[in-house]
């Protein structure tokens, strides 16, 4: 599942593919997808052109829509298990495209491709139930953790707490495993005990890891949907060296309450 780095790279790809001079004039939805189409009749005039820019916050991706005359609005995307964007010709639309924004010339489109169909889209804004982005809103994020240290969620095991987007928006399986390994602390302790053990170190490493993953190309474990196509051998080697715990054959693993696999050092068994 795409995590913070992969979602941010997706936003980068959209902004590189869709120039500020490019205009769009409608959308297309694959009828096989059960999610409802976007009803733009209340936010756009008939045949009104609009611009698109992307930004990310944790695991959320926002496409800001700026119409020629109507008020700006946003379309929120979650990428699901492996959704990604491409930009290409309408006539060469990828098989698993489920939603697209059509350019004015009618020949090209910004395509949301999602083989497993877990991705979602809707008109809206950032989800208030998700935490600040720890890489760009560090102070707000760390303050939120400390001010809520006695919340019932922090009484749960640390490895479960890390997957709760209410507290760490952007973390998923590989970031969880890597953070636990680098902290070198028992991941089965209550989250509040791990966090309070060395709060500054916890915050620093938790915020640094997704930034490192981003600069390594968003994780070669997702090379099949990396929109920027980072495939250089040197980057792959750097990524493999960076990854210490996730899918490490020498580590223990278990299935958590959410059905996700967690890798951890054998000494914590």
Q: What positions do the PLM features span?
A:
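Acidic, proline/glycine-enriched N-terminal capping motif
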Residues: 1-130, 262
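Hydrophobic/aromatic-lined pockets within catalytic cores
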Residues: 15, 19, 180, 184-185, ...
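Short alpha-helical "patches" and their helix-cap loops
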Residues: 24-28, 189-201, 222-226
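Residue-level marker of motif borders
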Residues: 54, 167-168, 254
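Basic, amphipathic alpha-helical segments enriched in Lys/Arg and hydrophobic/aromatic residues
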Residues: 198-215
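C-terminal accessory segment of soluble enzyme catalytic cores
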Residues: 210-269
């Amino acid at each position: 599942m795409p995590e913070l780095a992969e979602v941010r790279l997706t936003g980068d790809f959209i902004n590189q593919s869709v120039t500020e001079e490019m205009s769009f004039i409608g959308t297309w939805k694959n009828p096989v997808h059960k999610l409802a189409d976007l009803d733009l009749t209340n936010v756009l005039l008939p045949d009104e052109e609009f611009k698109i820019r992307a930004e990310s916050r944790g695991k959320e991706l926002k496409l800001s829509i700026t119409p020629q005359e109507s008020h700006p609005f946003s379309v929120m995307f979650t990428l699901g298990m492996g959704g990604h964007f491409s930009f290409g010709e309408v006539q060469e639309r990828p098989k698993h495209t489920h939603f697209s924004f059509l350019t004015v010339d009618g020949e090209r489109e910004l395509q949301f491709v999602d083989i497993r169909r877990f991705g979602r889209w809707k008109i809206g804004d950032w989800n208030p139930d998700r935490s600040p982005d720890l890489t760009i809103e560090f102070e707000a994020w760390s303050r939120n953790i400390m001010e809520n240290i006695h919340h019932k969620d922090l009484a749960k095991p640390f490895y479960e707490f890390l997957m709760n987007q209410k507290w760490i928006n952007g973390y998923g399986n590989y970031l969880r495993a890597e953070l636990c390994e680098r902290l070198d602390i028992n991941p089965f302790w209550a989250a509040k005990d791990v966090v309070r053990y060395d709060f500054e170190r916890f915050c620093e490493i938790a915020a640094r890891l997704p930034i490192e993953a981003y600069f390594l190309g968003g994780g070669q474990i997702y090379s099949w949907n990396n929109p920027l196509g980072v495939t250089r051998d040197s980057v792959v080697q750097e990524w493999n060296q960076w990854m210490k715990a996730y899918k490490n054959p020498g580590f223990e693993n278990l299935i958590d309450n959410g059905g996700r696999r967690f890798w951890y050092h054998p000494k914590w068994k």
